[in-house]
């Protein structure tokens, strides 16, 4: 089975008019319900999650106290065979976390992950290879969207406020 979920932080960053008619809720209960319904009917369970990991995969140290990323909890609480994530713009090479094989490619289509699965009576085995993207973007596409890109960058560069003191990463 393939279950697709998205971070519920979409509700925070997206304009309400873009979400008209769509309900985006906590991804954990939705994934749990889908998995429970389907897992006995399939050989492999796969969750595709537009979200990332809230903990360091090597140490378990909390990286973020928000609920924007919950992939670590997905692996702890649910038993998907595979979890494909994408949100944090960092590579997670194939590894097993709490019994779930997890991967995450970096941003902007710079790479992709080739995943192979072997299912037998002895169990399930997953491997992955990170493959750098190659080739070049067509010049006409770059030219066609250059104005839109400049507009987006100008908008992102607008000052929205000032602080009385610098806000550094360790500022309480």
Residue ranges of predicted features:
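A short C-terminal boundary segment appended to hydrolase-like catalytic domains
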Residues: 119-172
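Acidic, metal/ion-coordinating pockets
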Residues: 1-141
């Amino acid at each position: 089975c393939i279950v697709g979920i998205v971070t519920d932080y979409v509700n925070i960053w997206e304009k309400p008019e873009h979400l008209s008619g769509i309900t985006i809720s906590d991804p954990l209960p939705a994934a749990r319900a889908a998995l429970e319904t389907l897992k006995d009917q399939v050989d492999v369970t796969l969750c595709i999650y537009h979200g990332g990991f809230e903990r360091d995969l090597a140490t378990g140290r909390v990286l973020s106290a928000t609920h924007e990323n919950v992939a670590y909890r997905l692996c702890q609480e649910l038993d998907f065979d595979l979890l494909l994530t994408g949100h944090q713009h960092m590579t997670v090479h194939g590894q097993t976390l709490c019994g779930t094989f997890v991967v995450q490619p970096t941003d902007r289509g710079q790479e992709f992950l080739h995943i192979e699965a072997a299912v037998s009576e002895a169990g399930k085995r997953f491997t992955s290879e990170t493959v750098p993207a190659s080739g070049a973007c067509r010049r006409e596409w770059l030219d066609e969207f250059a104005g839109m890109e400049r507009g987006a960058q100008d908008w992102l560069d607008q000052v929205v406020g000032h602080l009385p003191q610098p806000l550094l990463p360790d500022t309480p």
